[in-house]
Amino acid sequence: MKTVALIPIKLGSVRVPQKNIKPFFDGTPLMHFIQKACLEAKNIDEVYIYCSNEAVKDYVLPGVKFLKRPEYLDGDNINANDFIREFMNTVDADIYVNAHTTSPFAKPETIDECVEKVASGEYDSAFCAEALRTFMWEDGKPINFDPDHFPRTQDLPLIYGETSIAYVFTKESFLKHNRRLGSKPYIK
């Protein structure tokens, strides 16, 4: 089974301009950390930076391939599934890993575990998440508890918040569901 990592880069970030190439805590460009994690992951065969701006090539590590993506994929109304679909039209694989530069603490072992779970066939996709057991509110209203019957924290339902470290999915699952998370995801 061929497994390919896709690291999308957009240099035109609205909130933090040029964030992906900015030096991080030790002066290393932010995008180097996820590249290293993907290169060190034993279950990834190829790693790609997918960006419309060729200036990012100066920040691509040895062993990582650069693939220029169409500029329309930089639009504000484009979501992850849009650029993944376009990437899959160019780079064929059985399993894809969508990893993000904004996760500089990603570990190769975490990525490998997600790939192994999907490759086993037990799951059609996987993603990394933070387990939360806390009082959640939206628009001034509680969403996971009744304030009239205030529960103990340990009795609250466990909610998972995606961390965007890695999304792993089979080609088959993406084509069936038209999204990176299938119908039976593994949550790491």
For each feature predicted by the language model, list its residue ranges.
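Short glycine-enriched, charge-decorated loop/helix-capping segments at active-site entrances
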Residues: 19-25, 71-73
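Short, high-confidence coil segments that cap the C-terminus of an alpha-helix
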Residues: 44, 93, 122-124
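N-terminal nucleotide-binding beta1-loop-alpha1 segment
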Residues: 1-17
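Short phosphate-binding loop-to-helix
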Residues: 48, 54-97, 105-113
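A short, N-terminal amphipathic alpha-helix
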Residues: 29-47, 58
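Hydrophobic targeting segments
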Residues: 2-7, 31, 46-49
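Conserved core of the sugar-phosphate nucleotidyltransferase
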Residues: 82-83, 104-186
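Residues in the short beta-alpha loop(s) of Rossmann-like NAD(P)-binding domains
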Residues: 27, 51-55, 131
